[in-house]
Amino acid sequence: MAAVRSKICGITRVEDALVAAEAGVDAIGLVFYPKSPRAVTLRQAKAIVAALPPFVTAVGLFVNATRGEVGGILDELPLDLLQFHGDETPADCEGHGRPYIKALRVRPGEDIAARCLEYCNASGILLDAYVPGVPGGTGESFDWSLVPRGLPKPVILAGGLSVRNVRVAIARVSPYAVDVSGGVEAEKGVKDAEKVRAFIREVRNA
């Protein structure tokens, strides 16, 4: 199996981004959703992106943002990839001049394969836990057996991942990448350096 990529989401501080980069992370996530405790200002985001070394992907996370809001961020910030975590249609996700991934919240009865086909131009599909009224970052996991094999898009697995369970998750789902936020935090928005390093090490050793 190819090496599984890792993304640390909800980065709010330059020092946390650098710890992740030095540990070998593939991508960091910046949350542009004001209701999130991990939301960043444009000023914070600029400082974080400017500090990233080459080959670390900067991902911007949006939840039901308008096209103007997304465009306003992109005018100021060199994001590599967009992540849409709300009720966005394929049309909402496209036309920004950046590749995108679409988050789907998984629950029993969800036809994940069909949803993947809806977002046929997505670079990948992120699978997260379904919690009513909460678009993501819940710290809750979901039943990994609900993820079908052979999906038509690269799968980024999220939802309640941590050092304790990420190896098992990778063995069960065989994702393209894993995405963690709360599982490597000291408090919301502040990463724990040792947890970040340990998580990335577990992914590499899976």
UniProtKB/Swiss-Prot annotation:
Short name of any one Pfam family annotated for the protein: PRAI
Isomerase among keywords: yes
Keywords assigned: Amino-acid biosynthesis, Aromatic amino acid biosynthesis, Isomerase, Tryptophan biosynthesis
E.C. number(s) listed in UniProt: 5.3.1.24
GO terms assigned for molecular function: phosphoribosylanthranilate isomerase activity
Catalytic reactions of this protein: N-(5-phospho-beta-D-ribosyl)anthranilate = 1-(2-carboxyphenylamino)-1-deoxy-D-ribulose 5-phosphate
Pathway assigned in UniProt: Amino-acid biosynthesis; L-tryptophan biosynthesis; L-tryptophan from chorismate: step 3/5
InterPro entries named in the record: Aldolase_TIM, PRAI_dom, RibuloseP-bd_barrel, TrpF_fam
Enzyme class (EC, first level): isomerase
Keyword hit for Lipid biosynthesis: no
GO BP terms: L-tryptophan biosynthetic process
NCBIfam families, per the entry: PRK01222.1-4, PRK01222.1-6
PANTHER family: N-(5'-PHOSPHORIBOSYL)ANTHRANILATE ISOMERASE (PTHR42894:SF1)
The family this protein is said to belong to: Belongs to the TrpF family.
Name of the protein: N-(5'-phosphoribosyl)anthranilate isomerase
Organism: Azotobacter vinelandii (strain DJ / ATCC BAA-1303)
